[in-house]
Structures are given as structure tokens and as C-alpha cells.
């Protein structure tokens, strides 16, 4: 029987508070944008299936982390069991861009001995007239850390699918090459799930959400 999904990838979304992490994830998993969003307390959990090639689906387990300092000790615990992530900054908030280095350094400390595949995301690109960070300097920073760079807008649904799908494809290619392997005791990558019964296509493509506070 064909697996519903080939692999499960655990992803984290990190960045300063108010950069729009929760809005981006909800746009991707639920297809909606909330004008008002309460700050994440601790960690929120979402999931969605992504078809990277015809008939090849990856289940994404996405962890939305709180950006406030008082919750950082909680969110750090989720770094080690993630294989990939989106690192967000707000293009209208230069401080959030300046803090990208701090987020990356913190992640390196807590993921050992593993590594996380990151994509740098300049969020809220619909507010281009208020931009405080140029695309050029963001691309330069991303290149310095070996990351891809993409600009997104949860409000206008710009590049949201692309950000998650591109990251998923990059991880999948690393798994196929053997650069990333399934390891006992590590939740970053899991092998596919085969159900006991055949589900309809409507049942397969679902998003689910759980809040861990």
C-alpha cells in the first residue's frame, strides 16, 4: 500500500516577537490571515502535507515558537529535534533583522550534534513603503550563512507556499543523498506512514493544530 507520506519533517519557525511567525504558519496550514493575533505562549504545533512531486508527499510538523525572551528556555528544547526551519525578520523592523545572527548562534548551540536547514524570510513584504531592510543586504546576510532568502506576506499570501515548499524540497534532496538520515532518538525526520485503511483525498489533506503552553 502506498504511504500517505514518504517522510515527516519537523520544522521550527523562529524570530523576534511580532515578526509574524504565527500569521505565516496559519496562512500556510489554514489558508487564512488573522488581522489580530495573540502572541504565542511557549510553543504552538501545526501540521500539513506537502506534495513535492506527483505522488510524493511529505508531512510537515511545524513548531511555532515564542519570540519573547521569557519563553526562550521553553522553545530552545525544540531546536534539537528539528531538521529545518524558517528564520523570520520583519522588513519594516531593522532590529529584528539585526537579531538574525543571535537567533542562528543560539540555534547552533542547542541543535548539536545535528544541523538545521534554514531559509531566511523577510516577512511583511506587502509593507514595502515602510521597508527598513533592503533585499540586497538580506540576500547578502543569507549567503554569508549559506541560506536561501525569500520575502513573504501572510496578509497578501505572497510566497507563503513557496517558502515552506522550497525548504521541504531542500531537506528532501539532502535525505535522498544520505546527507540527512533517520536516527533513533531524533525527531527531525521520520519515515512514511501507511494506514490500515485507505483514506479519501479529502481526509488526507488536513491540517491539525495543537497548543503546548
From Swiss-Prot:
SMART domains: RAB (SM00175), RAN (SM00176), RAS (SM00173), RHO (SM00174). Its EC number is 3.6.5.2. Mg(2+) binds at residues 22, 40, 64. Its cofactor is Mg(2+). It comes from the Eukaryota. Regulated by guanine nucleotide exchange factors (GEFs) including C9orf72-SMCR8 complex, which promote the exchange of bound GDP for free GTP. Regulated by GTPase activating proteins (GAPs) which increase the GTP hydrolysis activity. Inhibited by GDP dissociation inhibitors (GDIs). It is a lipid-anchor. Its main location: membrane. Keywords: Autophagy, Cell membrane, Cytoplasmic vesicle, Golgi apparatus, GTP-binding, Hydrolase, Lipoprotein, Lysosome, Magnesium, Membrane, Metal-binding, Methylation, Nucleotide-binding, Phosphoprotein, Prenylation, Protein transport, Transport. The modification Cysteine methyl ester is found at residue 213. InterPro entries: P-loop_NTPase (IPR027417), Rab39 (IPR041818), Rab_GTPases_membrane_traffic (IPR050209), Small_GTP-bd (IPR005225), Small_GTPase (IPR001806). The modification Phosphoserine is found at residue 201. One of its GO terms (biological process) is vesicle-mediated transport. GO terms for molecular function: G protein activity; GTP binding; GTPase activity; myosin V binding. Belongs to the small GTPase superfamily. Rab family. The small GTPases Rab are key regulators of intracellular membrane trafficking, from the formation of transport vesicles to their fusion with membranes. Rabs cycle between an inactive GDP-bound form and an active GTP-bound form that is able to recruit to membranes different sets of downstream effectors directly responsible for vesicle formation, movement, tethering and fusion. RAB39B is involved in autophagy and may function in autophagosome formation. Switch I, switch II and the interswitch regions are characteristic of Rab GTPases and mediate the interactions with Rab downstream effectors. The switch regions undergo conformational changes upon nucleotide binding which drive interaction with specific sets of effector proteins, with most effectors only binding to GTP-bound Rab. Interacts (GDP-bound) with C9orf72; C9orf72 in complex with SMCR8 acts as a GEF for RAB39B. Interacts (in GTP-bound form) with PICK1 (via PDZ domain); a PICK1 homodimer may allow simultaneous association of RAB39B and GRIA2 to PICK1 which is involved in GRIA2 trafficking. Interacts with isoform c of RASSF1; the interaction is strong. Interacts with isoform a of RASSF1; the interaction is weak. Interacts with the DLG4/PSD-95. Interacts (GTP-bound) with HOPS complex components VPS39 and VPS41. This is Ras-related protein Rab-39B. It comes from Bos taurus. The gene is RAB39B.
Amino acid at each position: 500500500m502506498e504511504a500517505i507520506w514518504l517522510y515527516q519533517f519537523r520544522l521550527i519557525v523562529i524570530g523576534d516577537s511580532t515578526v509574524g511567525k504565527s500569521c505565516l504558519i496559519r496562512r500556510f496550514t489554514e489558508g487564512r490571515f488573522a488581522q489580530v493575533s495573540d502572541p504565542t505562549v511557549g510553543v504552538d504545533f501545526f501540521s500539513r502535507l506537502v506534495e513535492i512531486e506527483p505522488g510524493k508527499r511529505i508531512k510537515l510538523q511545524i513548531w511555532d515558537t515564542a519570540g519573547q525572551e521569557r519563553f526562550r528556555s521553553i522553545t530552545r528544547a525544540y531546536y534539537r529535534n528539528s531538521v529545518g526551519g524558517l528564520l523570520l525578520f520583519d522588513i519594516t523592523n531593522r532590529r529584528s533583522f539585526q537579531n538574525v545572527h543571535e537567533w542562528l548562534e543560539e540555534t547552533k548551540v542547542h541543535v548539536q550534534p545535528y544541523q538545521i536547514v534554514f531559509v531566511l524570510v523577510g516577512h511583511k513584504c506587502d509593507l514595502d513603503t515602510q521597508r527598513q531592510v533592503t533585499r540586497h543586504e538580506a540576500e547578502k546576510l543569507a549567503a554569508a550563512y549559506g541560506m536561501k532568502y525569500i520575502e513573504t506576506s501572510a496578509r497578501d499570501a505572497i510566497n507563503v507556499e513557496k517558502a515552506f515548499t522550497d525548504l521541504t524540497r531542500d531537506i528532501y534532496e539532502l535525505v535522498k543523498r544520505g546527507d540527512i538520515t533517520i536516527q533513533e532518538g531524533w525527531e527531525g525526520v521520520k519515515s512514511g506512514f501507511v494506514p490500515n485503511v485507505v483514506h479519501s483525498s479529502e481526509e488526507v489533506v488536513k491540517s491539525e493544530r495543537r497548543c503546548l503552553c
